[in-house]
Regions:
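N-terminal edge beta-strand
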Residues: 23-51
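Bacterial N-terminal signal peptides that target proteins for export
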Residues: 1-7
């Protein structure tokens, strides 16, 4: 497990789109977090479309986004100081209380991908307390 805050590989790409996506609109999804919920917690996106998810932590504790979709997408970038990198893949996105993190990616695999917060508070998993959801990728 390796932590990286400002590595070039995970710096938010802004409005730049990867090759092959020129002229396509980036779909922006705002997800707010607090104890112990993602809202909305069900999201649908299209395979091949660039997606920007803005996580706004309105809670009183730190939260994070963990999902297998991070391994089922291309050109994954994050604007956050807390990013866990596993090999050459982003493993999770962390966002402190009162902060916003932006995740950009291009989902490539159709399916439903669960997501959750893996933080704990007083020994209790945020995921077990209900902080989870799903992203469905359709054609």
């Amino acid at each position: 497990m390796r932590w990286s805050g400002a590595a070039a590989a995970v710096v938010l790409a802004g409005t730049m789109l990867p090759a092959g996506y020129a002229g396509e609109e980036v779909k922006t999804i705002a997800i707010s977090t607090q104890e112990f919920v993602f809202a909305p917690n069900l999201v649908t996106v299209h395979a091949g479309q660039r997606v920007r998810i803005l996580f706004s932590n309105r809670g009183t504790v730190n939260h994070e986004f963990v999902s297998p979709i991070l391994n089922a997408a291309e050109d994954v970038t994050v604007s956050s100081q807390g990013v866990r990198v596993e090999g050459d893949k982003i493993g999770e996105v962390n966002f402190a209380k009162g902060k916003v993190a932006a995740l950009e990616m291009t989902p490539t695999k159709v399916g439903t991908f669960q997501f959750w917060c893996a933080e704990t508070t007083a020994g209790r998993s945020h995921r077990d307390l209900g902080m989870r959801g799903a992203i469905t990728v359709v054609k």
